[in-house]
Amino acid sequence: MARVTVEDCVDKVPNRFELVMLAAHRAREISAGAELTVDRDNDKNPVVSLREIAEETQSADALRERLIESNQSQIEVDEPEEDSMALLMGGEADKPQEDDMSEEKLLRALMEAQGQG
């Protein structure tokens, strides 16, 4: 069989840079254990990936989507805590009301509690 060149694939993917990116991505998929859609014929993964593109057993659109998905990353957004969420929504924070008890009032209340107990 004749060697596969980029020329065999240019009619499927006109941009040579994109073709190389897609073929490299497919070669990495094959290295990771993806099923081949053409016979290996003792070729290395990059050549097999170019043959798959040339024979259209792997569509350029599907490869492009998989390449994009593999390069995307998920960013986890921290959710605000309940108190912060209530304030953001215009409500009041869920916290105990502050007592305006002075030290003198506290001591008096303790003395009364001990005297009654």
Curated annotation (Swiss-Prot):
What is the protein's quaternary organization?
Answer: The RNAP catalytic core consists of 2 alpha, 1 beta, 1 beta' and 1 omega subunit. When a sigma factor is associated with the core the holoenzyme is formed, which can initiate transcription.
Give the UniProt family note: Belongs to the RNA polymerase subunit omega family.
Please list the GO biological process terms of this entry: DNA-templated transcription
Domain of life of the organism encoding this protein: Bacteria
Output the Gene Ontology cellular-component terms. DNA-directed RNA polymerase complex
- Please state the gene responsible for encoding this protein: rpoZ
Q: Which UniProt keywords apply?
A: DNA-directed RNA polymerase, Nucleotidyltransferase, Transcription, Transferase
Q: Per its UniProt record, what InterPro entries does this chain match?
A: DNA-dir_RNA_pol_omega, Pol_omega/Rpo6/RPB6, RPB6/omega-like_sf
Catalytic activity of the protein:
RNA(n) + a ribonucleoside 5'-triphosphate = RNA(n+1) + diphosphate
Identify this protein by name.
DNA-directed RNA polymerase subunit omega
Q: Which SUPFAM superfamilies match?
A: RPB6/omega subunit-like
Enzyme class (EC, first level): transferase
Question: What's the stated role of this polypeptide?
Answer: Promotes RNA polymerase assembly. Latches the N- and C-terminal regions of the beta' subunit thereby facilitating its interaction with the beta and alpha subunits.
Family annotation (Pfam families)? RNA_pol_Rpb6 (PF01192)
| UniProt key word S-adenosyl-L-methionine | no
